[in-house]
Every structure is written in C-alpha cells, then in structure tokens.
Amino acid sequence: MPRMRFLEVAGIVLGVLVLACVAGWGYWFYTPSIKPVPALDGELLDGSVTVDGIERNFRWYRPAKVAPSPPLVFVLHGSMGDGREARRMTYYEFDRLAERHGFLAVYPDGYEQHWNDCRAHAPYEANKKNIDDVGFVGKMIDFFVSQEHANPERVYATGISNGGQLAYRLALELPDRVAAVAPVAASLPDEANFDCKKSGKPVAILILNGTEDPMNPYEGGEVALYGLFGSRGKVISTDATVSYFAGLAGHHGPPRIVRYPDVATHDHSRAELQIWSDGPGPEVVLLKVEGGGHTFPHPFHRFPRFIGATNADLDAAAEIWRFFTDKRLGSPGT
C-alpha cells in the first residue's frame, strides 16, 4: 500500500475510534443538565451548629407559606457530595414540594463530603474519625424546633447511597426523634461490616432500591462500583433489610403489592410498591425498581447510565413525601 494511502486509511481508522470513544463516553457518562429550580417564592437559607467542637453547616428551603408547626425533611447527599449536590441530585423536587405543602427542606453537609454511617469498613474520614452525625441531626432538629417552630413529631430523613446509609443509622439510633426514613440505593451492612447500635424500636421506613444497582447489590454483597472500585464493605440483601424492619414492626404476613404503570418503556425498568402493614407497628414499604440502578427515579431527569437505569415511571421525591406525610412520632402505626 502506498505510504499516502496508508496514512489516509490510518487517519480514517483513528478518527472512527475517536468518534466511537466520544460517543461511548457520551452514552455512558453524560447526564443532561438539570435546570436550576424555577423561581419560587420562598427563601434558601444557611445555618450551622457546633458538634464536638466542629462547626457543621446546612442550608434549608423555607417556603413562602410555611405550615403551622411545619414538618422537617432532611435530604442527605451521597458520597463526595454536599447539601447543594443533594438539591441538584433530587432535581430540586423537595423545594417544589416544600412550596406546595409548607414543610422545611433541609440539606446538610457531611464531614469532608461523607457521612459516618453504619458501615465499619467505609474508608472516608467521617468514619475513621467517628464523626457524630447522629448528634448533628439531633442538634439540627433542636435548631429548627426552636428557631422555625418545626413540629418535633414530624421529622423525616431521606438520602441516596451514603445519605441513605445515614438514614438507616437514624432509624436504628434515633427512632425517638425521627418519625420516618426513606433510604435510596442503600441496604443494611452485614454483621462483619456493622458498626451501629440497634435500639430495637420499630420505625416507619420506605426503602427504594434498584435490582440492577452496580454499587449497592440488590441481593447483597460488596458495595463497590461494579464490585471493583471504592469498597465500603458488604451489605445484606434488600429483602433481608426489609425483613429486619418489618420484623421490628410486627409484620409477618405477605406484603400488599401495588405496581406502577410502565408508562416510560424507554427506561428498561418497572417499579412496584411492597407494603407491610398487618402488624401493630409502623408501615414498612419497599419501592422495588426492577432493572433500576444506583439512581433517583424521575420522569424527566436521569443519572449517568454507567450507574444504571433511572426509572421514569415515577417521581421519587413525591413518592417519599407521600409516604412521610401521615407519619408522626407516637401515633398508631408510626
């Protein structure tokens, strides 16, 4: 082959390879930009409390029309995030919900962008230094009850991934102050990886997990991206996690099943609710996303594809608030 012809062919092949790499990166890693929340009438405010000599920061959305003795919803970010990222990764939906329903949406910052959850083998500083994140949440509750007249019987917490793991810790260690939790893309650590104190008290809980999560394995196992990167130790299966909380609440019968219409066929996933409420304790719910990944479902936004499918049949924030709305400390079934 003449030299010029060879160079032409090589250039074409190289160009095709570059385009293929760019296309592949775009498909797996690109996330459509999430538009900033539309102008709402409320305020986004900043605050801080001191825990063990460390200043801990948070921000909160106060709607224009705050409900009398408003509920309090903590939205907990994932690893390498902060309160700003928690707002963005939940698509600003909790701000919108706060505006409609009058609750206070709170977005705290973890210690060095992580939470000290129940996983003993988590490698980040919040865990290594045993940062008191349960105490942090407790002090924030005190702040909002005192300064914003929040209802201490209607305190809720949700979070994704590392934030979901902290929600579990609150359920286990702070059930007398948190009326309900909703962990997303998270399961309880296994016995060898467990570093929390179990109160043994039931708590209302909604668990939202995807069956094809490449980081938090639905059937249990090592928490790492595709089982290879960034290990946080092992977790038990989603079903075992649900069974633990259902057992605490005294639910022993089969769950009631509610399937969501599969309106978004392009997302390669389907969702259903499994509801346990036959016993004397609080409601326990699994929102199972068949084919779902390490993501936060929404009809119009999605996470990068490399962490799995984002279900578009439902709005996760709205479902979580719907679960929270009738839960109160000390009331029957909660």
Question: Which sequence ranges carry the predicted segments?
Answer:
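A domain-start/cap signature at the N-terminus of enzymes
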Residues: 5-72, 90, 96-100, 129, ...
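Conserved beta-strand scaffold positions in the cores of enzyme catalytic domains, especially
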Residues: 46, 105-107, 286-288
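Serine-hydrolase catalytic machinery in alpha/beta-hydrolase-like enzymes
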Residues: 49-156, 165-173, 219, 296-307
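The conserved beta1-alpha1 loop
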Residues: 74-78, 185, 209-210, 290
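Acidic beta-to-alpha connecting loop that harbors the catalytic carboxylate
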Residues: 110, 211-214, 291-293
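A short acidic, glycine-rich active-site loop
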Residues: 125-131, 227-236, 307-311
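The feature captures the conserved acid-bearing segment of alpha/beta-hydrolase catalytic domains
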Residues: 179-266, 275-279
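C-terminal catalytic histidine-bearing segment of alpha/beta-hydrolase fold enzymes
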Residues: 205-208, 236, 246-334
